[in-house]
Structures are given as structure tokens and as C-alpha cells.
Regions:
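Sec-dependent bacterial lipoprotein signal peptides
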Residues: 1-24
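Processing junctions and N-termini across compartments
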Residues: 18, 95, 116-119
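N-terminal pre-ligand scaffold of iron-sulfur
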Residues: 27-114, 130, 151-167
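Cysteine-rich micro-motifs
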Residues: 117-127
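Short metal-binding segments enriched for Cys and/or His
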Residues: 128-141, 155
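Short Gly/Pro-enriched turn/cap motifs at secondary-structure boundaries
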Residues: 143-146
């Protein structure tokens, strides 16, 4: 039997997808405590001002620190354990993660997004996470060694044009 370039390409793609699914099943994304998350960006004006609109854009939301400045937090606003990282994935869909590093499990030790490589890094332990393509999976460092992924939050489209971020 002869396998042409198309067959080989399909086989490699299927093999890669299978390996990624198997690897994702082994990752622990529950190290960060489950605390309330509710961020209302459902108003189109709020989304236009505070949302993310393209690959490489990001935003931090930390209610206790007043980040971003002048954001209209309400009594019903909750930004998780260490805050929220809002990014755009490779298909321009918004994704949200807790900012706390799952290795450190400390709300004051937060990951930082790097716009040059589209990954997030913990300045304390050095772990690197893929936040734009593989849903917060660890790429290197102690998080990779221990299979600790970032805690993901749901980003739900709103009827009014923006999004809501919830746990």
C-alpha cells in the first residue's frame, strides 16, 4: 500500500490530536481554590473598552487592586483567587484564566502574559503556560513537570454583544 503526502499529513494530524487529547486528560487544573468568579462585560461598550479583540491582546482584572483602573466593579463582581487573565485565542475567541500560578497557589504570585510568544509565565517558579492555543497547559518549568495547568474560567457570549466571565 502506498501512502501519499495527503495520507501522511492526515495521519500525522490525527496522531498529534490524539496525543494532545491524552496529554490534556492528565493535566491537573484544580490546584487553584474554587472561588467566585463573576465579571460582567456584557455591555457592548464595556467589552469595547475592556475586552480583547485580537491575538496578542490581553487584560488583567483584579478587583482588590482596582485593576484595570476605573473599571466599574460592582458588589456582584468577583475576580477569582488571584485575578483574571483575559486573552484571545488563535481563532479570536476570548479565553479567561486565574492569574494565580498553580505551582505557588498564592493569590499574590501571579502569571504575566508575554505578547512576544503568546504565553504566560510565573515570575516566581518560572513555569510557562500556553494560554492562546492549548487552554492554559504547562509548557515548561515545575508546572510542566507536575502537570499543573492554569484554572480556566468560562467566557459566555451575552445577547447584548459583550461577554460574561464566570466559574
Amino acid at each position: 500500500m502506498h501512502f501519499g503526502p495527503n495520507h501522511l499529513s492526515r495521519f500525522c494530524s490525527a496522531l498529534l490530536a490524539t496525543l494532545l487529547m491524552a496529554a490534556c486528560g492528565e493535566v491537573n487544573d484544580d490546584r487553584i481554590p474554587a472561588v467566585s468568579v463573576n465579571l460582567d462585560l456584557s455591555n457592548q461598550g464595556y467589552w469595547d473598552l475592556y475586552g480583547v479583540h485580537g491575538l496578542g491582546q490581553y487584560r488583567y482584572f483584579i478587583r482588590n487592586a482596582g485593576i484595570p483602573a476605573n473599571f466599574p466593579y460592582t458588589a456582584l463582581s468577583y475576580t477569582g483567587f488571584g485575578g483574571i487573565l483575559l486573552v484571545t485565542d488563535i481563532s479570536n475567541s476570548p479565553l479567561a484564566y486565574d492569574l494565580a500560578c498553580p505551582v505557588e497557589v498564592d493569590p499574590d504570585v501571579t502569571i504575566e502574559f508575554d505578547t512576544d510568544n503568546l504565553r504566560a509565565r510565573c515570575p516566581s517558579c518560572g513555569s510557562v503556560y500556553d494560554v492562546c492555543e492549548f487552554e492554559g497547559s504547562p509548557v515548561s518549568g515545575p508546572a510542566h513537570d507536575n502537570k499543573y495547568a492554569l484554572r480556566r474560567y468560562r467566557v459566555i457570549p451575552a445577547a447584548t454583544g459583550g461577554y460574561n466571565i464566570v466559574f
